[in-house]
Regions:
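Extended substrate/RNA-proximal surfaces in nucleic-acid metabolism proteins
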Residues: 1-79
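Active-site environment of divalent metal-dependent phosphoester hydrolases
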Residues: 2-4, 58-62, 85-88, 113-117
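Charged helix-capping and loop-helix junction motifs
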Residues: 10-13, 41, 64-69, 90-100, ...
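A short helix-to-beta-strand connector/capping loop
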Residues: 22, 74, 103-104, 136
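Mid-to-C-terminal alpha-helical segments outside catalytic/metal-binding sites
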Residues: 122-154
Length: 154
């Protein structure tokens, strides 16, 4: 599960919050518009963890363009949700596909919370990417996910 961003995280031992057996922290950025980017950078600059921003697509319309651009430029992996890809209107889907093709987004996540109202929907996103001739991007996402979860980050 993702960890909600808090300035207190910079002072904490983050290993217990990482994906089991790795040093990968799935970080959910704040939903409020005014947050301290410096707090996020402090966490990113730690040597003991690898940060992945969870469902980054949610913030493109929430924050102002400058804040979103600054976050997208940070040297971390970024993840989008399969449901966003599958259920987006054509303009947003085109943007998500562009981010994948340009290497700005690196991972797909399901954001599954249960088997009924928010089930795993990875297969639908994979099929969509194949239909849109984005098989290479799908494979890149899968390889990185495997690397991060099996090996952790060295």
């Amino acid at each position: 599960a993702e960890v909600a961003m808090s300035s207190a995280l910079a002072q904490m031992d983050l290993q217990p919050l990482c994906i089991a057996g790795t040093n990968v922290l799935l970080l959910e950025l704040p939903y409020y518009r005014r947050f301290r980017l410096k707090d996020v950078e402090t966490i990113i600059n730690r040597n003991d963890i690898q940060v992945v921003f969870a469902h980054i697509e949610r913030f493109s319309r929430l924050w102002n363009k400058e804040t979103f651009a600054a976050v997208m430029e940070l040297p971390v992996y970024k993840q989008i949700n399969c449901s966003s890809l599958c259920h987006a209107r054509w303009r947003q889907r085109r943007q998500l596909l562009r981010w994948l093709s340009d290497g700005e987004v690196h991972l797909l996540g399901t954001d599954a919370h249960n088997l009924t109202s928010r089930p795993v929907n990875f297969q639908a996103a994979a099929q969509l990417l194949q239909r849109k001739q984005r098989t290479a991007e799908l494979e890149t996402c899968m390889e990185l996910a495997e690397q991060l979860t099996e090996d952790g980050v060295q």
